[in-house]
Amino acid sequence: MQARWVGGFTMKIDGNRKQDRATELVLTYYSAFNRGDWDGMLALLADDVVHDLNQGARETGREAFATFLARMHASYREQLRDIVVLASLDGDRAAAEYVVHGEYHGSDEGLPPATGQTYVLPGGAFFEIHDDRIARVTNYYNLQDWIAQVGG
């Protein structure tokens, strides 16, 4: 257990608060992403997870999320760094900010051709959490910045 003196009171971070568990859940999700552990990511999702794609459609369900991960794996190799997670006190919502370091190795439909271009791009995500599972993931990044970096 960690205890810190903050603003005149001691703050305890021991993993027992819902806020702590939400933060840990999101960090575990991103750790699995960075390892390429798609099964590990899927295990953290609710069966009816809602996934809002950046500037795209809303997809629902773990199977749709698995299909998304397979498509991403075919076109991109990415690592998220400098991850910061904030969670609501009740643990029902969380937000993350990160920097994507990636390589575009397989052309993705509607985007410029892939030739192994690299990119560094800030991004963020919002989460809803129900019953210690991720029920919604909404991702944001600047698509125009990414296109400029890969030469589109």
Task: State where each predicted segment sits.
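C-terminal and inter-domain tail/linker signature
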Residues: 3-152
